[in-house]
C-alpha cells in the first residue's frame, strides 16, 4: 500500500497517529510535548473528525495531575481519551496511572521522554520519566524515529482497544519529538480497516451509567485484595500477542517488519547491543559502516514493547553466535546494581543458551547528551579490550571521578555516501530556526530526497545560541546525532566567528557562508587567523553576505532569516532558485499569516537574498 509522504516532526506524527482514536484529549502543556496537544487543538477547532465522526473535545486542566484525573473520569464515562506529556508532568500523573491500569481502561499517553530534575533541572531528553512509570501497570511501546512514531503510535491505540491495558507510547524528547523527517503518513480509512469496533462497543457498555449501576473504586481488606489484584494477569499475558498481531497487520499493509524486538546487523554477529529509542538509528548506521568497512560482525536488538517484557521474544531476536552483549540505558538509577533495561535483559537471559554470555551495562545520553557513531564503536570495541574491559561504563562524557567512561577515537563519518549535511549558527529569536524548518520542508516536499532537520538550543531559547542541523540525501537518514562533518556551514551572527570553533566542522571542499558587515580589509582584519588557515588548507568555498544591511533596507530590522535562507538555496543548488523563492513565500504564508505578521515587502527579502 502506497502512503502519502509528508515532512513533519515527531510531535506532529504522534498527533496524527492519535487523532483518529481520540474522543477526548485532556491536556496540560510541558516541553517538549506541548506541540502534540497544540496540533490536536488546531485540528479540533477546524472541525476535523475522528474515526467516530466527531471532532476531538479538548480539556485543558490546571496541571498534569488534573489532566490525568480528567483522563480517568472520561474513560470511566466511556469516551476514548488521550493525553500528551513528559518528565515532571508524567510523574504528576502516576497516582492516576495506577487507577487507570487497575481498572483496565484503554487509553494511550504519548510521551516525549524527558529528563526528570535531580541535582538540576534539565528540559532535554532521556528515559528517567519513562522508567519511573514501569510498575504502574501501563504497557510501554517505544518508537525510535519519526516514522515509527506514526506507525507504532497507531499500534498502541489499536492494541489498547483490543486488550484493555492502557499504553504509554514514548519517544525521545527533542531528538525525535522535534526532529523533522520526511515520512509516510496514514490515511483515516487505512486505519479504520484495522480497528476492532466490537471492542470499542464493549468499552462503551462498561461506562458508568445510572441505568446500569456497578460498584468501582472500593476499599478492599486483606481477605480479598491480593486475589483481586492477580485477576488482571490474563490481560497482561495477552498484550504481547495483541501488539504482535497489530504489528503484523501494519507490516502487511505497508511492507514494514515491526516486531516486539527487532534485530539488525550481521546474522552471525558476535557482539550485540540492546537498546531502545533514537540511539538505535545511530547504532544501525554504525553497524552498516563497521560491518562493511572493517569486516566486523556486529548487531543490535531494538526494544519496541518494553512492558510487558517478553523474555522469550528477546532470546529469539539474539543471534546464536552472540558472545558479548552490551545494554544501553538512557537513565541513571543511583544505588542500583544496574539500570532498568540492563536488569531486564540479565533476568531474561538467565537459564537460556546465553546464560554465560558477558553482559555489560552502559549509560548514555542523559539530558540529551549527544551520542555519536564514534561512541557506539567504543561500546563494541570495549569487549575486545581485554585489559581495559569495563562491565559498567558511560559514553559521551569524560568521567574523571569514577573512571567509567569509554575512550573514543576521533570522529567517525558513518553517514551513507550522497548525504549532504548543513549546519547553521544563529541567535535565539532571530528566525534562523524557523527559516530552516521551512527549508527542510521545502526540500522534503518538493524533491525526491529524504530530509532531516534537528535544532539544538539551550533552555533560554530566546537570546541564546541556536544551531540548526539539516541533512538530505537519496537514502533514508539514520543520523540521530549532531553534525560534526558538514558540507555547508553558515554563521548568521558575525560575533560568533571569534567565539566558536565552527569552520573545523566543514569537510574539505565544503562551503562557508558568513553574515557580516565587513568588507575587504575589514574582513581580513576581523577574521581569526586559524579560520583563514583552515579555509585555505581545506579548499573551503567562502562567501559573505550583509544580511543586516539588506534587512534594514527593506524594513525587516534584525530579522535576517529569510535573506540568509535565500542565500543558502542559491549556494546549495538543491532546487532552482526561482522555485525555491516561490516555495519560501508559500511557506512564510503558511507559517506567519495566522499570526497577523507582515509577509512580504517589495522587494521581498527572499528575492534580495
Residue map of PLM features:
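Conformationally flexible catalytic loops at phosphate/diphosphate-handling active centers
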Residues: 52-56, 167-262
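Anionic-ligand anchoring segments at beta-strand to alpha-helix junctions in alpha/beta enzyme folds, i.e.
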Residues: 24-60, 274-301, 421-485, 489
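Peripheral docking tails and interdomain loops at the edges
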Residues: 324-413, 544-555, 559-595
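ADP-ribose/adenylate-binding Rossmann-like module
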Residues: 505-527
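Thiamine diphosphate
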Residues: 1-132, 137, 154, 373, ...
Amino acid at each position: 500500500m502506497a502512503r502519502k509522504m509528508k515532512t513533519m516532526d515527531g510531535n506532529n506524527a504522534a498527533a496524527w497517529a492519535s487523532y483518529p482514536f481520540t474522543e477526548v484529549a485532556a491536556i496540560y502543556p510541558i516541553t517538549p510535548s506541548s506541540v502534540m496537544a497544540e496540533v490536536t487543538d488546531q485540528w479540533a477547532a477546524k472541525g476535523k473528525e475522528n474515526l467516530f465522526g466527531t471532532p476531538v473535545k479538548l480539556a485543558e486542566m490546571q496541571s498534569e495531575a488534573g489532566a490525568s484525573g480528567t483522563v480517568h473520569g472520561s474513560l470511566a464515562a466511556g469516551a476514548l481519551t488521550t493525553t500528551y506529556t513528559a518528565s515532571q508532568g508524567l510523574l504528576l500523573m502516576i497516582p492516576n496511572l495506577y487507577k487507570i491500569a487497575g481498572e483496565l481502561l484503554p487509553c494511550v499517553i504519548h510521551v516525549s521522554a524527558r529528563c526528570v530534575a535531580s541535582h538540576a533541572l534539565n528540559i532535554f531528553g532521556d528515559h528517567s520519566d519513562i522508567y519511573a512509570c514501569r510498575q504502574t501497570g501501563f504497557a510501554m511501546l517505544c518508537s525510535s524515529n519519526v516514522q515509527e512514531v506514526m506507525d507504532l503510535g497507531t499500534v498502541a491505540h489499536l492494541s489498547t482497544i483490543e486488550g484493555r491495558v492502557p499504553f504509554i507510547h514514548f519517544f525521545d524528547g527533542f531528538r525525535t519529538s522535534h526532529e523533522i523527517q520526511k515520512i509516510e503518513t496514514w490515511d483515516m480509512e487505512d486505519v479504520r480497516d484495522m480497528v476492532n469496533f466490537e471492542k470499542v462497543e464493549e468499552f462503551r457498555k462498561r461506562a458508568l451509567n445510572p441505568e446500569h449501576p456497578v460498584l468501582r473504586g472500593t476499599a478492599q481488606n486483606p481477605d480479598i485484595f491480593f486475589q483481586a489484584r492477580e485477576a488482571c494477569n490474563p490481560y497482561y499475558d495477552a498484550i504481547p500477542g495483541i501488539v504482535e498481531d497489530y504489528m503484523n497487520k501494519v507490516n502487511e499493509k505497508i511492507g514494514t517488519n515491526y516486531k516486539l524486538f527487532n534485530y539488525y546487523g550481521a546474522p552471525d554477529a558476535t557482539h550485540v547491543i540492546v537498546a531502545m529509542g533514537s540511539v538505535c538509528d545511530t547504532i544501525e548506521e554504525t553497524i552498516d559502516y563497521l560491518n562493511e568497512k572493517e569486516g566486523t560482525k556486529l548487531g543490535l536488538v531494538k526494544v519496541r514493547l518494553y512492558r510487558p517484557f517478553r523474555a522469550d521474544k528477546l532470546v529469539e531476536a539474539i543471534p546464536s553466535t552472540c558472545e558479548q552483549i552490551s545494554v544501553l540505558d538512557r537513565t541513571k538509577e543511583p544505588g542500583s546494581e544496574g539500570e532498568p533495561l540492563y536488569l531486564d535483559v540479565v533476568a531474561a537471559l538467565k537459564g537460556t543458551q546465553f546464560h554465560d554470555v558477558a553482559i555489560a551495562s552502559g549509560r548514555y545520553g542523559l539530558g540529551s547528551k549527544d551520542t555519536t557513531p564514534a561512541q557506539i564503536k567504543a561500546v563494541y570495541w570495549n569487549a575486545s579490550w581485554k585489559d581495559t574491559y569495563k562491565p559498567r561504563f558511560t559514553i559521551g562524557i569524560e568521567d574523571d571521578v569514577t573512571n567509567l567512561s569509554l575512550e573514543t577515537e576521533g570522529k567517525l563519518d558513518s553517514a551513507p555516501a550522497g548525504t549532504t549535511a548543513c549546519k547553521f549558527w544563529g541567535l535565539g529569536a532571530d528566525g534562523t530556526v524557523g527559516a530552516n524548518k521551512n527549508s527542510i520542508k521545502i526540500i522534503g516536499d518538493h524533491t525526491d530526497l529524504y530530509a532531516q532537520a534537528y535544532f539544538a538550543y539551550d533552555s533560554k531559547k530566546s537570546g541564546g545560541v541556536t544551531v540548526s542541523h539539516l541533512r538530505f540525501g537519496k537514502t533514508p537518514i539514520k543520523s540521530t546525532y549532531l553534525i560534526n562533518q558538514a558540507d555547508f556551514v553558515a554563521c548568521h551572527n558575525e560575533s560568533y566567528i571569534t567565539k566558536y570553533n565552527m569552520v573545523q566542522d566543514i569537510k574539505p571542499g565544503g562551503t562557508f557562508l558568513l553574515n557580516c558587515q565587513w568588507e575587504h580589509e575589514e574582513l581580513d582584519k576581523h577574521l581569526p587567523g586559524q579560520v583563514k588557515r583552515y579555509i585555505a588548507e581545506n579548499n573551503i568555498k567562502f562567501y559573505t553576505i550583509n544580511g543586516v544591511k539588506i534587512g534594514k533596507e527593506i524594513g525587516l530590522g534584525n530579522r535576517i532569516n529569510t535573506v540568509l535562507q535565500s542565500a543558502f538555496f542559491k549556494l546549495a543548488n538543491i532546487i532552482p532558485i526561482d522555485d525555491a523563492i516561490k516555495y519560501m513565500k508559500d511557506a512564510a504564508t503558511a507559517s506567519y499569516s495566522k499570526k497577523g505578521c507582515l509577509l512580504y515587502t517589495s522587494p521581498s527579502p527572499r528575492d534580495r537574498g
